[in-house]
């Protein structure tokens, strides 16, 4: 794309327009600045609310992929890529899933998480190459993230995923973008002009984080990773999480702390299994077998 074409493209983007509410923000004091930022941030949940049907559809596709052995793969550049990596990295400790079940890829690789990598987002071929490096297949779901909706790196990845007949999702902040036209499901969280013109790490980034939270949380709930609203598959890998596992067992069963701790010990610190043991009266092996028959869904296992 020529410089002139790029300038014209940017001029048409909602995220690149100037915000009338912050036009003189450099004349304000600290309290006034943060008030404007906070006021603008209030528009973000509403923008995400308009996308709920598309988000729910994406969740259904992700769950179908998980049940068939597929993965959820996020890909993005800059802030968008970092948010994808962040959401993916939280899934193993929160839900006890393998680290490759939800994958985050950022343009420029690991170094780009902390340092800007010049030109990384401009290479569509690298987007495809990074998917090839993780052996992306038609069983997987690709979620491309870019506020602009035009990032070449992400577009390259989406086109490659489409060529494999994989499900593709685009999360953008500009309606009718190139990514929207490629993806099977378009989540267009249009938050309007940023407080600082073009700084899409702000409202656009916040909207992206809310959407990513929904995608993984809803998918994991449907996969049986929660009981009521408790994270029963949490990995008790540190002192805080071990204490949380005890509380989860106590809350789910209304048992004492001593019973929760003793049952967790017998259940190898598996909170879901411990809850099954307490509520069903079954021993570890039998409780585990019942859970397996119900694909790890505790509520269904208890209802048998």
Curated annotation (Swiss-Prot):
Molecular-function annotations in GO: carbohydrate derivative binding; carbon-oxygen lyase activity; ether hydrolase activity
Pathway assignment: Amino-sugar metabolism; 1,6-anhydro-N-acetylmuramate degradation; Amino-sugar metabolism; N-acetylmuramate degradation; Cell wall biogenesis; peptidoglycan recycling
Catalytic residue list: 90 (proton donor), 121
UniProt keyword Lyase present: yes
Annotated GO biological process: 1,6-anhydro-N-acetyl-beta-muramic acid catabolic process; amino sugar catabolic process; N-acetylmuramic acid catabolic process; peptidoglycan turnover
InterPro entries linked to this entry: Etherase_MurQ, MURQ/GCKR, SIS_dom, SIS_dom_sf
Class of this enzyme: lyase
Reactions that this protein is recorded to catalyse: N-acetyl-D-muramate 6-phosphate + H2O = N-acetyl-D-glucosamine 6-phosphate + (R)-lactate
The UniProt record lists the keyword Cytoplasm: no
Span of the signal peptide: none
A Pfam family the protein falls into: GKRP_SIS_N
CDD domains from the UniProt entry: SIS_Etherase (cd05007)
EC number: 4.2.1.126
Domain called SIS: residue spans: 62-225
Additional detail: A lyase-type mechanism (elimination/hydration) is suggested for the cleavage of the lactyl ether bond of MurNAc 6-phosphate, with the formation of an alpha,beta-unsaturated aldehyde intermediate with (E)-stereochemistry, followed by the syn addition of water to give product.
Annotated family: Belongs to the GCKR-like family. MurNAc-6-P etherase subfamily.
Described purpose of this protein according to its UniProt entry: Specifically catalyzes the cleavage of the D-lactyl ether substituent of MurNAc 6-phosphate, producing GlcNAc 6-phosphate and D-lactate. Together with AnmK, is also required for the utilization of anhydro-N-acetylmuramic acid (anhMurNAc) either imported from the medium or derived from its own cell wall murein, and thus plays a role in cell wall recycling.
PANTHER family (UniProt xref): GLUCOKINASE REGULATORY PROTEIN (PTHR10088:SF4)
Quaternary organization: Homodimer.
Name under which the protein is recorded: N-acetylmuramic acid 6-phosphate etherase
Provenance organism: Actinobacillus succinogenes (strain ATCC 55618 / DSM 22257 / CCUG 43843 / 130Z)
Upper lineage: Bacteria, Pseudomonadati, Pseudomonadota, Gammaproteobacteria, Pasteurellales
